[in-house]
Amino acid sequence: HTAGRYQAKRFRKAQCPIVERLTNSLMMHGRNNGKKLMAVRIVKHAMEIIHLLTDLNPIQVIVDAVINSGPREDATRIGSAGVVRRQAVDISPLRRVSQAIYLLTTGARESAFRNIKTIAECLADELINAAKGSSNSYAIKKKDEIERVAKANR
């Protein structure tokens, strides 16, 4: 990990390597805050598992998963004259990447909860399913749901 200050300026987090964004996103929920070495280890194990299961380059799998699970449009709340209605908006590329990484790590975290499988195995499964675009990935399901809501509010 680079220990870089990617939050200091507006678009600087776009320069952050995608694997590190994934690692940083894993450090969520109070008890895991700041435990970056733990997150690095999880990502490393997940990459090894991906390589064993698919024989593909794990970084390519991560990139495909992020591309497939980033929602293309979203519904935002627009309030005018006391009436709040949802309006469909396109999502900027940077937010697509951030949202995709968030959905992937959330899916891995939820599937690892109260489960024998380690979070590394769950993360590997989530990434492989999302890279394939299969609907038993949490991130793909959420993305479809977000886009369906946006389509209804066009």
Swiss-Prot record:
Coiled coil: none annotated. GO terms for molecular function: RNA binding; structural constituent of ribosome. GO terms for cellular component: small ribosomal subunit. GO terms for biological process: translation. SUPFAM superfamilies: Ribosomal protein S7. Belongs to the universal ribosomal protein uS7 family. This is Small ribosomal subunit protein uS7. It comes from Nicotiana plumbaginifolia.
